[in-house]
């Protein structure tokens, strides 16, 4: 996976890299320390939740997410629960106040109760995501 050059060249990119190294990177000390979602074992693990919950890191994430989404012309930002929820909230909270971009999330299973079972905003169909 690569990072778009517009993000790597941003003045806040080096600081975000430092924060990710400090907050998310875990060296377990042995090759079988962590079992990954794929079932494979790894010595290393990235837990990005602390990055998303850190004030400075989340501000930089939001700035860079919005920069890239502006370049792409995205109308909406979101993804699969639970992982996409913090990033979606960061992106929406740091967007320009005049931004028309809206957030959404995709549930793994229907909630089965409540009024809007998908939590998606009206008009999302056919929009640029």
Task: Locate the predicted segments by residue.
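Active-site-facing substrate-recognition patch
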Residues: 2-72
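Short coil/loop linkers at secondary-structure junctions
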Residues: 26, 75, 98-101
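Conserved hydrophobic/aromatic pocket- or pore-lining residues that grip, position, or stack substrates
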Residues: 39, 77, 103
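Gly/Ser/Thr-rich beta-alpha loop segments that engage phosphate groups in nucleotides
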Residues: 41, 81, 85, 116-117
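Fold-independent oxyanion-binding glycine-rich loops
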Residues: 48-49, 80-81, 106-109
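Glycine-/small-residue-rich active-site loops that bind phosphorylated ligands and cofactors
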Residues: 53, 83-84, 111
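Short glycine-rich phosphate-binding loop at a beta-alpha junction
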Residues: 73-83
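Short, glycine/charge-rich flexible loops or terminal/linker lids adjacent to PRPP-binding catalytic cores
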Residues: 88-129
